Swiss-Prot record:
Names of required cofactors: Zn(2+); Fe(3+)
InterPro entries named in the record: Amidohydro_3, HutI, Metal-dep_hydrolase_composite, Metal_Hydrolase
Chain residues that bind Zn(2+): H70, H72, H238, D313
Locations listed in the record: Cytoplasm
Principal EC category: hydrolase
Source organism of this protein record: Xanthomonas axonopodis pv. citri (strain 306)
Name assigned to this protein: Imidazolonepropionase
């Protein structure tokens, strides 16, 4: 069999769902043709392969490229000053009253043009790519007006054009109530003006809603979901981060790809997610940065068979994190997730959370050839070490980059 590129003398984490766990192969090879994997598995069982190029991995580990399935990467401004203020005793309410918080990011993002937003976002993206990310979701939500939301989504698309990475755009117009507006009239605008325009331009694949007592109600979230489905967009939700608004249960009824945060999720929400196949996206960076104490119900989610994905939640206010490797360590340390769960959370289950499990997140024939090649002794090193980047090479669609 002819192939374009062959990686051999490697140890593999295939993340093959059928095999379960990490799907470890001790003496493995990965063969690629036209950007897709044609074989990934044991060298001893491989068909005869004639590669144009072969790479001796010298016993390095190969995993699927990492997938960050929840980010707010595109924004302008810097809120490090608020971090300092909180350390000195200021409350979130104090900061918001002084014009800070999400309003500060909205103000800066609205003021930035495409070029400025792109320049601000590229270093954050590059930091993720340097740790093996090959696909990431990027949400809007810092424009909170049609033209500015479109601008954010447009820049997200430009990021994907400028780097070898797949960008999955999500419309999060229902992130917060804009300054000077009221929630219901604004949600009406999201549903009747923003969603139709964004869907018509093909700028987003899904919608997201922040369903919380300080943002939007369950009824308002449902209004957004109905509008999204009418325009062919998939559904995600920020749910149960600060209180139990039963948002995850609602989203599951609408077939949501994922429910994210979910610290206050109850058993009814767990059952609804399990029945719908909705992925739990856990965000340990936000939990850490905000010094939260309410743990997501990991044991209940495991028992119910709900897939567990992880993400950085990169954003300027509650998780200024661009390191998936550190997020894995946080998930293990704070949430007591296993090594297998942490690595699967940034590969196989993250692909599921983005509706891409048919072609991303595993090493097997037919999948896109997105790889991360690691200088590690064992998979646990990816989760155990902190401030450590063992990436040897990143491969996107079969091309080293």
């Amino acid at each position: 069999m002819h192939c374009d590129v062959l990686w051999h003398n490697a140890q593999l984490m295939t993340l093959d769902a059928a095999a379960g766990g990490l799907g470890i192969v001790d003496d493995g090879i990965v063969a690629c043709r036209h950007g897709h994997i044609v074989y990934a598995g044991a060298a001893a069982q491989a068909p005869a392969l004639q590669p144009d190029t072969a790479h001796d991995c010298q016993r390095r580990w190969i995993s699927p490229g990492l997938i960050d399935c929840h980010t707010h990467l595109v924004y302008a401004g810097n809120r490090a000053n608020e971090f300092e203020q909180r350390l000195r005793g200021a409350s979130y309410a104090d900061i918001a009253a002084a014009g800070g918080g999400i309003v500060a990011t909205v103000r800066a993002t609205r003021a930035a043009d495409d070029a400025a937003l792109l320049a601000a976002s590229l270093p954050r993206l590059d930091a993720m790519l340097a740790e093996g990310v090959t696909t990431l979701e990027i949400k809007s939500g810092y424009g909170l007006a049609l033209d500015d939301e479109i601008k954010q989504l447009r820049v997200a698309r430009q990021l994907g054009a400028q780097r070898k990475v797949e960008v999955v755009p999500t419309f999060l117009g229902a992130h917060a109530v804009p300054p000077g507006e009221q929630a219901q009239p604004y949600i009406d605008q999201v549903c009747t003006q923003m969603i139709p325009a964004i869907a018509a331009q093909g700028l987003a694949e899904a919608v997201d809603v922040f369903c919380e007592h300080l943002a939007f109600s369950q009824a308002q979230a449902e209004q957004v979901f109905i509008a999204a489905q009418a325009h062919g967009l998939r559904i995600k939700i920020h749910a149960e981060q600060l209180s139990n608004q039963h948002g995850a249960e609602l989203a599951a009824r609408y077939g949501a790809l994922s429910a994210d945060h979910i610290e206050y999720l109850d058993q009814h929400g767990v059952a609804a997610m399990a029945a719908a196949g909705t992925v739990a996206v856990l965000l340990p960076g936000a939990f850490y940065f905000t010094r939260d104490t309410q743990l997501p119900p990991i044991a209940a989610l495991r028992t119910a068979g709900v897939p567990l994905a992880l993400a950085t939640d990169c954003n300027p206010g509650t998780s200024p994190l661009t390191s998936p490797l550190l997020a894995m360590n946080m998930a293990a340390t704070l949430f007591r997730m296993t090594v297998d769960e942490c690595i699967a959370g940034f590969t196989r289950e993250a692909a599921r959370a983005l509706g891409r499990s048919e072609r991303l997140g595993q090493l097997r024939a037919g999948m896109d050839c997105d790889l991360a090649i690691w200088n590690i002794d064992a998979p646990a090193d990816l989760v155990y070490r902190m401030g450590f980047n063992p990436l040897h090479a990143r491969v996107w669609r079969g091309h080293p980059c």
